[in-house]
Swiss-Prot record:
Pfam family, one: Phage_rep_O
Family designation: Belongs to the phage O protein family.
Function: This protein is essential for phi-80 DNA synthesis.
Species for this entry: Enterobacteria phage phi80
Annotated protein name in UniProt: Replication protein 15
Gene Ontology terms: biological process: DNA replication
Gene: 15
Annotated stretches, region: Disordered: 1-20, 152-172
Compositional bias per record (Low complexity), positions renumbered to this chain: 152-163
Polar residues biased stretches: 1-15
Source organism superkingdom: Viruses
Keywords: DNA replication, DNA-binding, Early protein
């Protein structure tokens, strides 16, 4: 009898290098205890929970009772599509958990502090006849029993979806552009985009990175512009704030080779700001920017 050993490959623990750690010194969200106590009793879908938490962070996270946002801002926070965000916000507003008022291209959203108005349970999904009170069945479709017919129907649906995919993509893009007329650069799906000023800021950072690392690859300007937009819309940083902090980092003996994109700048923003305010040591690469001369901002800040 031979001795054998079974080798079990456990899944690797996924760790992000330089992962983020929660720290109260970086800020916290102040929410009334009454709201926190009532939240566990809410019967919400996953998407509704995501959007509800996003509304809480966009308001109470910034010590505000309400905020002006677009569906895209919440979509970026939650990873949901604009349509799913719109549906979830509508459901939350109908149940009086939040208030949502359309204002031009934006929405004013906030948590409804009248907790007695909250509808804790999900509404019934079945439609009822006015007089009899009878509900429609959940599914009025009777599927065929034969395998051949089912297979045929399935393939017909696939062909139909394939034929209409281009049309729906064009429709989504047109809808995106009508909702975000300021978009100067964007992906075909509209998931990533930026304004003309966001693009100029991204180009300016790219030109500075090129001075530090001349052999670096050309960046994806749509992705960089999108990150600049997120810093502006979600983090409340102005283009001038972004350029000024990157200028400081690009001259610092350590950060100049570690902050080479808007993404890394955003990730290390708080740490960079603290070091800059504390007068951290820095070493200039090239004296390209003089804070006493605002000509450096021409074309970036308008």
């Amino acid at each position: 009898m031979s001795n054998t050993a079974e080798i079990i490959n456990f899944p690797n623990k996924t760790e992000q290098p330089g992962g983020r750690m929660a720290d109260l010194s970086n800020g916290y969200t102040k929410v009334a205890n009454e709201i926190q106590q009532l939240k566990p009793r809410l019967r919400l879908s996953g998407r509704e929970w995501q959007c509800f938490e996003a509304v809480i962070w966009l308001t109470y996270g910034w010590n505000k009772k309400q905020d002006r946002v677009t569906n895209t801002v919440i979509a970026e926070l939650t990873g949901l599509s604009d349509t799913h965000v719109s549906d979830a916000l509508k459901s939350l507003a109908e149940r009086k958990i939040i208030f949502s008022q359309k204002q031009g291209m934006m929405k004013i959203v906030g948590v409804n502090t009248d907790l007695s108005a909250w509808i804790l349970d999900k509404p019934e999904t079945g439609r009822k006849f006015p007089k009899t009170g009878k509900s429609f069945p959940k599914s009025g479709i009777t599927f065929p029993k034969t395998v051949d017919t089912q297979y045929k129907n399935k393939n017909s649906i696939k062909r139909s979806s394939s034929e209409n995919s281009d049309e729906s993509s064009d429709a989504r893009l047109k809808k995106f552009l009508s909702t975000h007329p300021e978009a100067a650069v964007y992906t075909p799906s509209g998931a990533k985009w930026g304004s003309a000023e966001d693009l100029e800021t991204a180009k300016w950072i790219s030109s500075r990175v090129k001075l530090i690392n001349p052999t670096c690859k050309a960046p994806d300007m749509t992705s960089w512009s999108n990150t600049v937009r997120l810093m502006r819309q979600i983090d409340n940083r102005s283009h001038q704030d972004i350029c000024a902090l990157y200028d400081w980092a690009s001259k610092h003996h350590f950060w100049q080779t570690n902050i080479l994109s808007p993404e890394s700048l955003r990730k290390q923003w708080d740490k960079l700001t603290m070091q800059r305010n504390a007068g951290g040591e820095q070493r200039a690469v090239k004296p390209d920017l003089d804070f006493n001369n605002t000509d450096w901002a021409y074309g970036v800040i308008r």
